[in-house]
């Protein structure tokens, strides 16, 4: 992705030049808002397939009987989605969100490789900041404390999501 967003020979600038005919160089990894856009595109590109597989597994595991009954009752496609599909795949959505929230620590390598937190540490995320603080700034105590707090926040978010999954399963068994 660093090569794709390179301002001189990058694929994105070449595609934009081919489409628009304007030879304007866009500094994707140097400009702050564009740097975040480039990081976001790279991260979405890398994480979307796994999330789609989880959600597709959830959709394929849905029972057909409620949908057939809704069809007989004359429910529209939107009503079937809102009243049947969405509530039944919510455990899979919560699981995907929990995995994704824990996977956010992996974003460190994308930021480190593409922008290294620059320009001026403005595309820095929590894990790159903890790394820079601990190893470049030699402040191991603060870096360790920040990483513990971040892990605890991730744990609490995951606990909240799984609590909702268990609550929805408990209500479904009643």
Task: Report residues per predicted region.
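A structural signal for multi-pass alpha-helical bundles of membrane permease subunits
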Residues: 1-174
């Amino acid at each position: 992705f660093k090569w794709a967003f390179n301002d001189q020979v990058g694929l994105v600038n070449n595609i934009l030049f081919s489409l628009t005919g304007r030879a304007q160089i866009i500094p994707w990894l140097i400009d702050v808002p564009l740097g975040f856009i480039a990081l976001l595109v790279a991260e979405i590109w890398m994480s979307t397939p796994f999330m789609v597989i989880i959600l597709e597994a959830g959709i394929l595991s849905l029972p057909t009987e409620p949908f057939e009954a809704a069809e007989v009752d004359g429910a529209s496609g939107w009503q079937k989605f809102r009243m049947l599909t969405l509530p039944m795949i919510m455990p899979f959505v919560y699981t995907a969100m929990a995995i994704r929230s824990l996977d956010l620590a992996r974003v460190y390598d994308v930021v480190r490789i593409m922008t290294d937190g620059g320009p001026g540490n403005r595309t820095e995320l929590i894990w790159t900041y903890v790394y820079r603080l601990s190893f470049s700034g030699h402040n191991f105590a603060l870096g360790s404390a920040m990483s513990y707090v971040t892990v605890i926040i991730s744990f609490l978010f995951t606990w909240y999501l799984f609590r909702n999954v268990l609550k929805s399963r408990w209500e479904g068994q009643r």
